Swiss-Prot record:
Gene Ontology cellular component list: NADH dehydrogenase complex; plasma membrane
Protein name according to UniProt: NADH-quinone oxidoreductase subunit C/D
The organism of origin for this protein: Blochmanniella pennsylvanica (strain BPEN)
Family: In the N-terminal section; belongs to the complex I 30 kDa subunit family.
Organism placement in taxonomy: Bacteria, Pseudomonadati, Pseudomonadota, Gammaproteobacteria, Enterobacterales
InterPro entries listed in its UniProt record: NADH_DH_suC, NADH_DH_suCD, NADH_Q_OxRdtase_suD, NADH_quin_OxRdtase_su_C/D-like, NADH_UbQ_OxRdtase_30kDa_su, NADH_UbQ_OxRdtase_49kDa_CS, NDH1_su_D/H, NiFe-Hase_large
Enzyme Commission numbers on file: 7.1.1.-
Compartments, as annotated in UniProt: Cell inner membrane
Amino acid sequence: MVDIMCNDSTGVSLVKNIYPILDDLFSVFSSVDFVLQPTHTGILIIWIKREMVIPVLTFLKTTSKPYIMLYDLHGIDERLRIHREGLPESDFTVFYHLISILRNDDIIIKVPLLEQSLYIDTVVSVFANANWYERETWEMFGIHFNKHPNLTRIIMPKNWNGYPLRKEYPARATEFNPFILTKQKEDLAMEGLLFKPEEWGMHKHSKHENFMFLNLGPNHPSVHGVFRIILQLNGEEIIDCVPDIGYHHRGAEKMGERQTWHSYIPYTDRIEYLGGCVNEMPYILAVEKLAGITVPDRVKVIRIMLSELFRINSHLLYISTYLQDVGAMSPVFLAFTDRQKIYDVIESITGSRMHPAWFRIGGVAHDLPRGWECLLRKCLDWIPHRVSFYVKSTLENSIFKKRACGIGAYNAKDALDWGVTGAGLRATGIEFDIRKSRPYSGYENFDFDVPIGNGISDSYSRVMLKVEEIYQSVRILEQCLQNMPIGPFKSDHPLATPPMKEYALQHIETLITHFLQVSWGPVIPANESFQMIEATKGINSYYLISDGNTMSYRTRIRTPSFPHLQQIPHVIRGSLISDLIVYLGSIDFVMSDVDR
């Protein structure tokens, strides 16, 4: 974490030695137009006026060592927030999170908005992938983005009323009035289901054109979940397509405002339901930043060990289902059997299989069981042989290679423009793995390589990178097995939740703390924190705001699959329907990760 508390006479925290980009910004814009915000995010956060958004973002994207990727864009309802000392007056805030690969650095631009003038210009002309993020921000907060090409609902149904992430909006179903389906409501709902190509941005280029429209999904086996793609076809050729998401939306960010810091942990498992403990990591680390908790080394290694086991399991499922999409039926049945062996290890350690909810604020739920080394040893001896079997039997098959090579291809520029992370980005030749570039939880102490591609990310290079990542995860697990630190499985920090059982049985104060933290939740100091990790499908992160309460004031979950699906039309236009199936299988996504 970087300290940016030292203010100069202009009221702007000038820490130019730490953030060289400030020198560049102040050479073009007046420093009085910037307000720096100190947080626990470890990221430079700057507040600017709304009329400066496009000039500032354009400058950041085109400067030397540019902030080339729009990583995230969303909003905050500030109206009930108490701890806002030193920040500009704001009822609602829009934030833009940019990443510079060359600098290995981030910057967050925040724009304050008042309720009576809740609008801002779209930045789609600067960052193409802002399109979906702005649509989601509009439908969740009611913030209007001027000149947006298609400002319509994206997550919620078309006939939905209200803005769910506003503070006055109910957080529980029981807070709504009883549902009554009137004839008028039914007619509106049915009308919303009518397909009108113009409403989806699909148009004829001339009056003589006569294209066919086809719904792929939302219940097609090759769309990997409840996901619909509307195709505009000229024969078998895809002229245009529009992804239709939101069927799996559960309001995960809204739930974060009603659950305690501790009781929200099970929800993190279900954001991307195949990742298990991998999904718990960014949330737990972000909360620990807010609480000021440093965990023991044993906790760090245990967390890495569980994360890599889940990574291998997720990759095995991805590889086998992708092969099934292409036409090879046997691998998926074999892989499900193989994955159970890894689940056996996970269950022996955590007590659960897919959704363990096992990480804790300040540690893990309990220590490793006796005999865990033998279980892991047997698993590590077996995994490489099985992966080698899949490679030799199918992935190196000439028929499969001809079917996958060159399909769904894009270069590094396209990947960065659309916010692609994970194997899709690394296949373009960019070595950007958060475990290496920005180590967390002790990854800096592990020896492993980051597989990258040769410049073009296509349906074959992406799956082969996942294979190499399995081998690297095995290397990491070998080091966990050989170098597991001795020590406690939980920090003795007062905000570690729940506290160590041994202390609670001996000290009445600790017993009271246990009761309060588990029932009401720990009171986390007011601040903002952020943590990104290398998840199974790309970069996943949590941006948390605490207002000094037992629950999060704002929980922003950025998942990798959301931008990956937004990229589909750009990549697949001009291809065949059969190529789309191959491309979809190579992305590696689940709809819970998209819709949250």
